[in-house]
């Protein structure tokens, strides 16, 4: 849904007649994909076969959620994901959108007028989620590690029982869409 990569991989696999190869559309990005890959590796180490791993990843991918606060919509506009009108209005009003990516769909959750307040709201939203305790929470950032460190501190303060909170810098492709000063959280719901 987010990109055509999974569809392209499936077409290629069908063309060459792959056997025991499963193409999975993760319906997520960045650290959300990291959660899936690490889980697949864990399942393999437990002795699961490719079919069992595929079935479990298909099940768990629907429970992955990604929350993020963006400093600007400029980069989403440049990448064709947001209209020029929306990007311009957000810039003029100094709106910092708080979004959720879940099941391949992007949803606007809130609008903040301050990037630090928007990022702090991510931890507050996470506090209201039913987290799967068997998975870590990943804090992602595009360019400003201090914002990620602040968010990590907020999560640890609000959710002291979270099994693991780790910081991850987003890659160049995601970074080119979300811009600088963006920060987010990837997690698995119950």
Segments and roles (model prediction):
Residues 2-22, 28-190:
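Mixed-charge interfacial surface used for oligomerization/domain docking
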């Amino acid at each position: 849904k987010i990109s055509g990569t999974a569809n392209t991989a499936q077409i290629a696999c069908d063309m060459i007649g792959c056997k025991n190869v499963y193409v999975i559309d993760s319906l997520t990005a960045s650290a959300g994909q990291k959660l899936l890959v690490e889980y697949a590796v864990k399942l393999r180490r437990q002795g699961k076969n490719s079919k069992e791993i595929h079935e479990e990843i298909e099940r768990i991918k629907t429970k992955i959620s990604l929350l993020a606060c963006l400093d600007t919509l400029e980069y989403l506009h440049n990448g064709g994901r947001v209209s020029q009108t929306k990007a311009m209005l957000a810039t003029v009003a100094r709106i910092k959108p708080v979004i959720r990516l879940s099941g391949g769909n992007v949803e606007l959750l809130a609008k903040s007028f301050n990037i630090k307040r928007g990022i702090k709201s991510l931890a507050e939203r996470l506090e209201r989620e039913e987290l799967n305790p068997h998975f870590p929470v990943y804090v992602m950032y595009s360019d400003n590690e201090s914002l990620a460190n602040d968010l990590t501190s907020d999560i640890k303060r609000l959710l002291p029982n979270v099994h693991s909170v780790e910081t991850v810098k987003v890659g160049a492709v995601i970074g080119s869409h979300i811009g600088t000063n963006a920060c987010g959280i990837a997690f698995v719901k119950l």
